[in-house]
Amino acid sequence: MSEPNRNSPLLKPDWQYIEKLSLQDFKAADWRVLNAQRAPYHAEQQVRQVLRMLADSRDDPTFGYRVNNYRHSLQSATMALRDGLPEEDIVVALLHDIGFVVCPDMHGAFAADLLGAYISDRNDWMLRRHAIFQNFHSPERPDVDQQGRERWRGHPHFEWAATFVAKYDQAAFDPVYDCAPLEVFEPLVHRVFARTPQPRPQFQDEVRNDQEQETS
């Protein structure tokens, strides 16, 4: 069913629509209007939509694990919370698999691209590689390289990635674990996303080089 022939609502009643239908027709004044409205829009909507993406998977089925991705994410974050980890690490635990279903083969990069501008180097690095580190804990899985993580041994963030995966990822599939509700983590997510974003082109280049080496 198609959407009705009308504008989508504006977030604020005093905001303006840009009536032109093609970006190439936008004038400088139009871009000034959009740019003035962009920052407050993201400030209000970014975290809301991230959390909604996770919350909407609350009742999703699983393809064999005893918990779905929502419960796995909550368990991971709850374990990090109860271990007294910093807020950033708890938020990373909550969202490390946010793309597991919609972007399964690149879900580490999905999470890193979502969070990377707001988190430390160690967590950006870990997120991009955590799926490969997880293979170490699947000794009888036939379709992965259990020693794939060894290519990065000696890297400053190797031990954190190994620790995160061992304690808060591969061990977070318990159907009777007493998870904290999502609402507990919402203020933490807001505070992380409220940080001044810092682009990470060097990490994108590093991961691209890793991928090129894997296919060469």
Which residues make up each language-model segment?
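Metal-dependent phosphohydrolase cores
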Residues: 1-94, 98-216
